[in-house]
A protein has these predicted regions:
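Generic enzyme active-site microenvironment
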Residues: 289, 323, 349
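Glycine-rich, N-terminal phosphate-binding loop of Rossmann-like dinucleotide-binding domains
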Residues: 107, 257, 292, 324-327
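Inter-motif core of Ras-like GTPase G domains
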Residues: 305-326
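Switch I (G2) and immediately adjacent beta-strands of P-loop GTPase domains
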Residues: 71-80, 86-88, 271-298
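Loop/turn-to-beta-strand initiation segments
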Residues: 285-287, 318-319, 345-346
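C-terminal-of-GTPase-core extension/linker across diverse P-loop GTPases
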Residues: 18-25, 29, 159-282, 298-300, ...
């Protein structure tokens, strides 16, 4: 149990100085309606008292928690910089669990910049990227899963991605991991008792109970890892390469799916010479659509580079849509393109269904790929293609309340923890000493702790928060 306690308190003993008061601009750079400067730390209110003059009768030091006050920001010589609202959030009831002061001023570049400079001159230092969230983690208000979910909320590319991130921010994944660690802690403790007091003859009973619990835990881990592909797509999106010969309708399809004229469409073959990437949300799933250059033999140097890039996207994309103008005969080049698509990734899309066809869907079923017919002019058939893309993401089988692994760090740690449990199971099966079972159980316990940050290394924490934006 000493080891458990030591690892639990590691988070608050990491090499990180919480004594400094930090400040940063929390809104995007540029002109806007409102600009926000966030201050956190022991000197936050002393700084506020120096620079804020309230329009009300209450003195700054008498401001109550979770209140808003209107006034002006003044510099060291009493000169007014801007009108502002200040928000008071006293520890531990704030984002960082420290005293926090937020200044809301007009969103001009100069006003926000001048106020931040004044705050820094008054005793704060400029916050590093992600440092406010890092303090929330260090002060125990959130765990590492929740901290990473903050950035996922900000970067969500779709409604499903936002929902998954909010679920993790609320602590649902953390709760599952915590329950697993609690069960492992219980059995580690009970097994240690059998080692320390062998005369009690409890080992067979404890090992039998452990086997049943481990099987249930491993089954749940395996299911979560299986479903993690859905989580990854919801978080990071699915890449869809739109490929085909020149004038097959690739750019027209991209424009229809985006509901805007993003790509240039002409009757001139080779108009698209480089890959054009855009994000679109279909039924809440983020898709990264790549309109590639038309694939053909060419002596044009620039177009040839585009064709090479198109072939690279065909190799690496999650899904490849092979577009074919159904008013044109099927060629050897079309056959070669279909064969170049990795197994299980391709679908054939016959375009220009509003025109008199030379090809029917049944003509191409011999290639063993899904075949769709559509018109980017009328929209006919595109809903079926969208349903196909959603089904490719795996989202069609996801329950509303399902907790998904979406972060690669979490997925890898869960996989390693599962492997440690499998080794423990094998050790029990062959009748090895209890001490060896404990080695694998402790490793599984520690790896799960790294998910939530209880046993994570200091350098990993720093690396995670360095990905955040300033002011968060």
């Amino acid at each position: 149990m000493h080891r458990v306690l030591f690892l639990y308190v590691r988070r608050s003993s990491m090499i990180y100085d919480l004594s400094h008061t930090i400040a940063a601009i929390a809104t995007a750079t540029g002109e806007s309606g409102v600009g926000i400067i966030r201050i956190s730390g022991t000197e936050a209110y002393n700084i506020g008292e120096k620079i804020f003059r309230s329009k009300g009768k209450t003195r700054f030091k008498d401001f109550k928690d979770r209140t808003i006050h209107f006034g002006t920001i003044v510099d060291e010589k009493g000169r007014e910089i801007d009108e502002a609202l200040v928000l008071i959030m006293k520890r531990p009831h704030s984002y960082t669990a420290e005293d926090v002061l937020e200044i809301q001023c007009h969103g001009g570049r100069q006003s926000v910049s001048d106020i931040l400079k004044l705050v820094l001159r008054s005793g704060a230092r400029l916050a590093r990227a992600g440092e406010f969230t890092q303090r929330a983690f260090m002060n125990g208000r959130i765990d590492l899963v929740q901290a990473e979910a903050v950035m996922d909320v900000i970067q969500a590319k779709s409604s499903k991605g936002l929902s998954t991130a909010l679920s993790q921010l609320e602590g649902r994944l953390s709760g599952i991991v915590a329950d697993m660690r609690t069960e492992l802690t219980d059995f580690i403790t009970r097994l240690e008792v059998t080692v320390d007091y062998p005369e009690e003859d409890l080992e067979d009973i404890v090992v039998h109970d452990l086997e049943k619990t481990m099987r249930c835990m491993m089954k749940r881990m395996e299911q979560m890892l299986k479903d993690s592909s859905k989580g990854r797509i919801i978080r990071d999106g699915m890449t869809v390469a739109i490929a085909g010969a020149p004038n097959a309708g690739k750019s027209s399809l991209l424009n229809y799916l985006l509901a805007e004229d993003r790509a240039i469409v002409t009757d001139i073959p080779g108009t698209t010479r480089d890959a054009l990437e855009e994000w679109v949300s279909i039924q809440g799933i983020p898709f990264r659509l790549v309109d590639t250059a038309g694939i053909r033999e060419t002596t044009d140097t620039v177009e040839a580079i585009g064709v090479t890039k198109a072939r690279n996207y065909i190799e690496t994309a999650d899904t490849v849509l092979i577009l074919k103008d159904r008013t044109q005969p099927f060629s050897d080049e079309d056959k070669a393109l279909i064969k170049s698509v990795p197994d299980g990734k391709g679908a054939i899309v016959l375009t220009k269904s509003d025109l008199k066809p030379l090809l029917e869907c049944r003509d191409l079923e011999v290639y063993g790929l899904p075949v769709f017919s559509l018109s980017s002019k009328t929209g006919d058939g595109i809903n079926l293609l969208e349903e196909y893309l959603v089904s490719r993401s795996g989202e069609s089988g996801t329950g509303e309340n399902e907790v998904l692994l979406s972060n690669m760090r979490h997925i890898e740690l869960m996989r390693q923890s599962l492997n440690a449990l499998k080794r423990a199971e094998e050790t029990m099966y062959v009748g090895m000493p209890t001490d060896l079972i404990l080695v694998d159980l402790r490793e599984a316990w520690e790896l799960l702790g790294a998910v939530t940050g209880e046993t994570v290394q200091d350098d990993m924490v720093g690396e995670i928060f360095s990905r955040f934006c300033l002011g968060k």
